[in-house]
């Protein structure tokens, strides 16, 4: 009795239909040429952490709830006197998601979190970097259902970067559109 391994919904959708759609659209000769999701990087800068070290730890705990894996606290590299910032002071946190956790996060982002954003009109289609990666910013991290605002009491913004193996923005846009990213028209 062999057990079947768990496959995230979006990964199965990519394997079954999206890969063939992209192959037909762009005329790839090899399966490995088809763009795929590589990683998702979540970054949260916490400005209040300059005065209170616990804010960065609290942000890292919230990000761990959102991402499903432990967040790494980021530290300042240089001192900036106008911001009262010293070197090696905690200023935020980040997480890099790959494989199954990446697909699960993107599924929750598209189906649950983005519809909860106030006055959401779609994602900016111009936020590609020229090499097939897409970045978006979220003003409040409390749009994720894992975060209880009553317990947190704080609301921070976060950056989400979706890295793909696509060589051009058009290929990456086609890939993310196939994953039902809600781009503005």
Curated annotation (Swiss-Prot):
Cellular compartments per GO CC: ribonucleoprotein complex; ribosome
PROSITE patterns reported in the protein's UniProt record: RIBOSOMAL_L5
GO process annotations (BP): translation
Sorted UniProt keywords: Ribonucleoprotein, Ribosomal protein, RNA-binding, rRNA-binding, tRNA-binding
GO terms assigned for molecular function: rRNA binding; structural constituent of ribosome; tRNA binding
Superkingdom classification of source: Bacteria
A family per Pfam: Ribosomal_L5_C
SUPFAM superfamilies: RL5-like
InterPro entries: Ribosomal_uL5 (IPR002132), Ribosomal_uL5_bac-type (IPR020930), Ribosomal_uL5_C (IPR031309), Ribosomal_uL5_CS (IPR020929), Ribosomal_uL5_dom_sf (IPR022803), Ribosomal_uL5_N (IPR031310)
HAMAP family (alphabetical): Ribosomal_uL5_B
Stated role: This is one of the proteins that bind and probably mediate the attachment of the 5S RNA into the large ribosomal subunit, where it forms part of the central protuberance. In the 70S ribosome it contacts protein S13 of the 30S subunit (bridge B1b), connecting the 2 subunits; this bridge is implicated in subunit movement. Contacts the P site tRNA; the 5S rRNA and some of its associated proteins might help stabilize positioning of ribosome-bound tRNAs.
PANTHER family: 60S RIBOSOMAL PROTEIN L11-RELATED (PTHR11994)
Subunit description: Part of the 50S ribosomal subunit; part of the 5S rRNA/L5/L18/L25 subcomplex. Contacts the 5S rRNA and the P site tRNA. Forms a bridge to the 30S subunit in the 70S ribosome.
Family per record: Belongs to the universal ribosomal protein uL5 family.
Name of protein: Large ribosomal subunit protein uL5
Organism: Rhodopseudomonas palustris (strain HaA2)
Gene: rplE
């Amino acid at each position: 009795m062999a057990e079947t391994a768990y496959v995230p919904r979006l990964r199965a959708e990519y394997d079954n239909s999206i890969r063939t759609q992209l192959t037909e659209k762009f005329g790839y000769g090899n399966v490995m040429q088809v763009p795929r999701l590589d990683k998702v990087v979540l970054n949260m800068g916490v400005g209040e952490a300059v005065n209170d070290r616990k804010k960065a730890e609290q942000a890292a705990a919230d990000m761990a709830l959102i991402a499903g894996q432990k967040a790494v606290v980021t530290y300042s590299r240089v001192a900036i006197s106008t911001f009262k910032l010293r070197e090696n002071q905690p200023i935020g946190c980040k997480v890099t998601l790959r494989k199954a956790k990446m697909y699960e996060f993107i599924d929750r982002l598209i189906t649950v979190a983005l519809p909860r954003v106030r006055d959401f009109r779609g994602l900016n289609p111009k936020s590609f970097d020229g090499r097939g990666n897409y970045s978006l910013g979220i003003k409040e991290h409390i749009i994720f259902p894992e975060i209880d605002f009553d317990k947190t009491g704080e609301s921070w913004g976060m950056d989400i970067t979706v890295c793909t193996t696509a060589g051009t923005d058009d290929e990456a846009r086609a890939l993310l559109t196939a994953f039902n990213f809600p781009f503005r028209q």
